[in-house]
A protein has these predicted regions:
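ABC transporter nucleotide-binding domains
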Residues: 12, 19-213, 219
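Structural motif
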Residues: 90, 250-253, 283
Length: 307
């Protein structure tokens, strides 16, 4: 079971969630938490279990085992009504006008008609949809339909946001607008859980990241924590060295070679000065530096050859 700090009671907790479809374990003891005011990036390959986990959170599918809690209490229908959800399969009424659709959805979440209109107009303006407010959704571009879907997840001022690929189909300007909105919501204390294949964006935006592979969580933490767990990596440029000079160095693994620069991961306890000495033995060394792996590199290390 998850151990939740008393100061983090306002957290969305996914605790030991399991879900099988026949012989396939879509979720296998999935556990993590999204703290109040936190942007949590949920990443993994296609079919890794991201969407199933989110569906369990929202009650779209029932877990076979495990529990989801908000603020320490198991979720029920009334609690989930206060969540904002962007599903993988977008669900808009194609012939309804944008404004009418958002007002209707806000009212479904308990807003009065005037409050619903104000909220709908606000999100229409913030997401750049003013010129489309009276248009039918089916007449919008896919990118603008995505903006409407995002407005639908935000219009009722949700306590928790669960967004499945929210940046999919957005142009760069819209990505920046949404990123600012998510930061603002997190700044107001809302836990924000979202999935994305855009790992550079996740690294830039998120407080913490969870990596899922074949239904199991394989890594979770801040990017710096994931870096610390990946060990020390150095980059060496020894232009006079023969190809493969580093292949036999004890306690090291060659993880990349680019333009003569060799990237080496050092095992625990290996002194980087021993690596430098080995490089100097081949001739002049023009570069010797520690490498900070990107989230893309950390992701590849975490999932290996899997998906």
């Amino acid at each position: 079971m998850l151990e939740i700090d008393a100061l983090e009671i306002d957290a969305l907790e996914i605790d030991g969630v399991c879900k099988r479809y026949g012989d396939v374990a879509a979720c296998d003891q999935v556990s993590f938490q999204v703290r109040a005011g936190e942007l949590f990036g949920f990443v993994g390959g296609n079919g890794a279990g991201k969407t199933t986990t989110m569906r369990v959170v929202l009650g779209v599918v029932a877990a076979d085992a495990g529990e989801v809690r908000w603020a320490g209490a198991p979720l029920d229908h009334a609690t989930r009504r206060r969540f904002g959800y962007l599903p993988e399969e977008r669900g808009l009424y194609p012939r309804m006008r944008v404004l009418d659709q958002l007002v209707y959805l806000a009212e479904l979440h308990g807003f009065g008609v005037n409050q619903a209109h104000r909220a709908a107009e606000d999100w229409i303006a913030r997401l750049g949809l003013r010129e489309h407010r009276d248009a039918e959704v089916q007449r919008l571009s896919l990118g603008n339909q995505q903006r409407v879907q995002l407005a639908a997840a935000l219009v009722h001022d949700p306590e928790v946001l669960v967004l499945d690929e929210p940046f999919s189909g957005l142009d760069p300007l819209a990505v920046d607008v949404l990123a600012a909105v998510l930061r603002e919501r997190a700044g107001a204390g809302v836990p924000v859980l979202f999935s994305s294949h855009q790992l550079d964006l996740v690294e830039r935006l998120c407080d913490r990241v969870g990596i899922i592979q074949r239904g199991r969580m394989v890594a979770c933490g801040t990017v710096d924590e994931l870096r610390a767990g990946s060990g020390t990596t150095v980059v060496v440029h020894a232009p006079g060295a023969a190809p493969g000079w580093a292949d036999g160095l004890a306690g090291t693994t060659v993880v990349g070679v680019h333009n003569g620069r060799v990237r080496l991961r050092l095992a625990d306890g290996v002194d980087d000065q021993a690596v430098l000495a080995a490089a100097l033995a081949t001739g002049p060394v023009r570069e010797f530096s520690h490498h900070r792996p990107s989230l893309v590199e950390l992701y590849r290390d975490a999932v290996g050859d899997g998906s």
